[in-house]
């Protein structure tokens, strides 16, 4: 129980840090902050960003505890989404597709229904003109 409370606190910190990132202006400082978010909450930026969805899933299985895996995959999807929205194609679509795939996986395997997650998936579909 204590470990779950600790991880819930990590999720809350991640949400606050992501909101702070979204307030930053474009530029190198914003990019460094994004890379720090990856490093602090999910892992190495250059590694995770360049993974396919399948590779990210294998990484999750190997690196994260089972009870944290779904939440960390959702964090990774959030990072893909916010980064993808700030880029041009083809990187934009690549990251948005990865974000959608991870959100879809989390939605199917999570024990909690999330309207926020559903809204993000709808937003991605709209951005990708699906």
Predicted feature descriptions by range:
Residues 1-73, 105, 126-130:
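N-terminal alpha-helical interaction modules that lie
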Residues 66-92:
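Mid-chain, well-packed structural core segment of small domains
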Residues 89-130:
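Amphipathic alpha-helical binding modules
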Residues 22-33, 83-95:
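Short coil/turn connectors between adjacent alpha-helices in alpha-solenoid helical repeat scaffolds
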């Amino acid at each position: 129980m204590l470990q779950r409370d600790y991880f819930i606190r990590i999720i809350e910190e991640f949400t606050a840090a992501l909101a702070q990132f979204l307030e930053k202006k474009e530029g190198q400082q914003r990019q460094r902050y994004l890379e720090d978010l990856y490093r602090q909450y999910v892992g190495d930026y250059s590694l995770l960003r360049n993974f396919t969805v399948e590779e990210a899933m294998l990484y999750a299985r190997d690196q994260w505890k089972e009870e944290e895996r779904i939440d960390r995959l959702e964090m990774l999807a959030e990072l893909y989404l916010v980064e993808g929205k700030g880029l041009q194609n083809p990187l934009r679509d690549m990251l948005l597709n990865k974000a959608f795939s991870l959100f879809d996986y989390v939605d199917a395997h999570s024990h909690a229904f999330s309207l926020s997650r559903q809204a993000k998936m709808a937003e991605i579909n709209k951005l990708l003109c699906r």
